[in-house]
From Swiss-Prot:
Origin: domain of life: Bacteria
Lineage: Bacteria, Pseudomonadati, Pseudomonadota, Gammaproteobacteria, Enterobacterales
General function of this protein: Together with the chaperonin GroEL, plays an essential role in assisting protein folding. The GroEL-GroES system forms a nano-cage that allows encapsulation of the non-native substrate proteins and provides a physical environment optimized to promote and accelerate protein folding. GroES binds to the apical surface of the GroEL ring, thereby capping the opening of the GroEL channel.
GO CC terms, sorted: cytoplasm
Family under the similarity heading: Belongs to the GroES chaperonin family.
PANTHER family linked to this entry: 10 KDA HEAT SHOCK PROTEIN, CO-CHAPERONIN GROES
Subunit-level organization: Heptamer of 7 subunits arranged in a ring. Interacts with the chaperonin GroEL.
Name of the protein: Co-chaperonin GroES
Length: 96
């Protein structure tokens, strides 16, 4: 199945979180937490402005991003892969 985000939405594949602490302790379950870093797999055409123009998104497919998994984030399981649908404003930074 292929998903194409609309408007200012971005599809992100969450990166795996490190399962060891800095001291070498193996973390499991909720102790490991969920990563707030992922790879952009698809983007919408852009945000629709009040005058009807479309402002292209700053992120592109392949960017590694740090995101805020807030109220607007939606998790979807597609082809046995967990993906997040975020708005561009949920993305805090692009990792360069």
């Amino acid at each position: 199945m292929k998903i194409r985000p609309l408007h200012d939405r971005v599809l992100v594949k969450r990166q795996e979180v490190e399962s060891k602490s800095a001291g070498g302790i193996v973390l499991t379950g909720s102790a490991a937490g969920k990563s707030t870093r992922g790879t952009v797999t698809a983007v919408g055409k852009g945000r629709v402005l009040d005058n009807g123009d479309i402002k292209p998104l700053d992120v592109k497919v392949g960017d590694v991003v740090i995101f805020n998994e807030g109220y607007g984030a939606k998790t979807e399981k597609i082809d046995n892969e967990e993906l997040l649908i975020l708005t561009e404003s949920d993305i805090l930074a692009i990792v360069e």
